[in-house]
């Protein structure tokens, strides 16, 4: 099974706080236009579908203080959520559901170990469901982890650790990895990998306007019951596009993205250990589609 973005708490959101003592809020809406549906062998099946999402979150620093090396010791609370509507037309229920809700709340703590290393610990829970009318205990997952972060250079951080969740109905420990690489100059380059893959190349046109080429791979999942069995429904997609961003106040900005969704897999997976570690070369998927999004963010 491909590990989706929501199997572990979004640890990387806390790293965005840095030494900022203010809250961060974001709201984003995405649209992927309709495209033909194909099986895992690439054969076109009857039907097509689109995807619409609303994604938002708030991160509140509860306590931040700096040590003697000017590195943060901090506690924070984060609440994030995504609602996705899958506009499936003439697609069998064997391949897709009509909606997904992923919502997480967590408490996070970071502290430096020395000048080169920090430790980040998280503890939280989330709801992962495709049935908003009846949210069962099986769709509520606990999650947490410990990540050791190495500050190799001022623009390069990497980390290793462990994550724990009850995605299979009982606690399991998984390895976790983190990478954040930034390059400045005429163009700003950023590569980030933890729960999702993010890539951007940006140019600051003036004090208020920034233009970027962006790419991201992300995923959603829900705990479902299918044919009397406990399963997960997984939707994973990636996109690349042009993103203009305009700062309308000191800490407030709006942005929009237009581009292409390169891939969007949708499939059901058994909620078992064997299925979790099983990985297919290809999954049932939608074809290449147009991608659009708009968003607003504060405090970033």
Identify the function of each model-found stretch.
Residues 48-54, 97-103, 136-142, 171-175, ...:
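Residues that define the transmembrane beta-barrel architecture of outer-membrane proteins
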Residues 27-29, 75-79, 121-123, 160, ...:
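Membrane-embedded beta-strand positions of outer-membrane beta-barrel proteins
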């Amino acid at each position: 099974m491909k590990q989706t973005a929501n199997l572990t708490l979004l640890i990387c959101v806390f790293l965005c706080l840095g030494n900022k003592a203010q809250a961060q809020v974001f709201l984003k809406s995405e649209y992927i236009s309709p495209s033909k549906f194909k099986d895992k062998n690439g054969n076109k099946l009857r039907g097509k579908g689109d995807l619409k999402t609303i994604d938002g979150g708030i991160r509140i620093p509860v306590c931040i203080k700096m040590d003697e090396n000017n590195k943060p010791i901090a506690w924070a609370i984060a609440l994030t959520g995504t609602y996705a509507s899958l506009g499936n037309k003439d697609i069998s229920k064997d391949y897709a559901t009509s909606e997904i809700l992923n919502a997480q709340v967590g408490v996070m703590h970071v502290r430096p170990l020395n000048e080169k290393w920090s430790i980040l610990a998280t503890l939280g829970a989330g709801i992962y469901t495709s049935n908003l009318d009846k949210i069962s205990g099986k769709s509520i997952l606990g999650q947490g982890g410990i990540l050791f972060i190495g500050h190799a250079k001022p623009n390069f951080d990497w980390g290793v650790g462990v994550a724990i969740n009850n995605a299979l109905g009982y606690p399991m420990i998984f390895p976790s990895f983190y990478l954040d690489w930034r390059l400045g100059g005429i163009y700003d380059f950023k590569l980030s990998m933890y729960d999702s893959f993010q890539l951007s190349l940006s140019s600051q046109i003036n004090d208020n306007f920034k233009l970027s080429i962006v790419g991201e791979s992300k995923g959603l999942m829900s705990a479902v019951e299918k044919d009397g069995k406990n399963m997960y429904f997984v939707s994973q997609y990636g996109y690349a596009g042009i993103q203009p961003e305009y700062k309308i106040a000191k800490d407030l900005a709006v942005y929009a993205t237009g581009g292409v969704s390169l891939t969007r897999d949708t499939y059901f997976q058994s909620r078992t250990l064997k299925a979790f570690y099983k990985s297919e070369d290809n999954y049932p998927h939608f074809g290449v589609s147009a991608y659009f999004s708009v968003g607003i963010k504060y405090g970033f």
